């Protein structure tokens, strides 16, 4: 996706939502399956346009601690400096455009490489 985010989105952060029990159930199953099969799992939260509210950050923290555990690294990029808040890198508050995705992919690759280096 190319282009910039429409100004209709730039003044309305998304409200914090409760954790969806069905999604949490399947996340738990995914984590259990990966552990059982010896698959190394990393959780990634990609950038959003808006800086998340305290309530939104707490929702991610609770989801992570309740359903994932401390043995799974969490790469939290939701409020990534240089990307979040830059309307030229998003098509809407939740989706980066091609350039935003390119920049984020580079940062994510670096973070993953540092996790998996011996």
PLM region spans:
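Secreted/periplasmic serine-hydrolase-like ester/acetyl group-modifying domain
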Residues: 1-37
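A short, structure-level motif marking secondary-structure boundaries and short turns
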Residues: 14-16, 48-49, 93
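Acidic-and-aromatic substrate-binding clefts and catalytic sites of carbohydrate-active enzymes
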Residues: 18-23, 49-59
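Non-transmembrane, interaction-prone segments in cytosolic or luminal domains
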Residues: 19-20, 38, 49, 108, ...
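Active-site segments of SGNH/GDSL-like serine hydrolases
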Residues: 28-56
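C-terminal regions of proteins
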Residues: 54, 59-118
């Amino acid at each position: 996706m190319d282009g910039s985010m429409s100004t209709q989105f730039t003044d309305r952060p998304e409200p914090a939502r409760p954790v969806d029990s069905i999604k949490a159930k399947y996340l738990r199953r995914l984590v259990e399956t990966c552990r059982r099969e010896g698959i190394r799992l990393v959780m990634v939260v990609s950038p959003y346009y808006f800086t998340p509210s305290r309530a939104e950050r707490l929702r991610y923290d609770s989801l992570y601690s309740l359903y994932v555990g401390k043995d799974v690294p969490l790469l939290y990029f939701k409020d990534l400096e240089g990307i979040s808040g830059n309307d030229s890198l998003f098509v809407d508050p939740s989706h980066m455009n091609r350039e935003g995705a390119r920049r984020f992919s580079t940062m994510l690759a670096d973070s993953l490489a540092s996790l998996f280096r011996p």
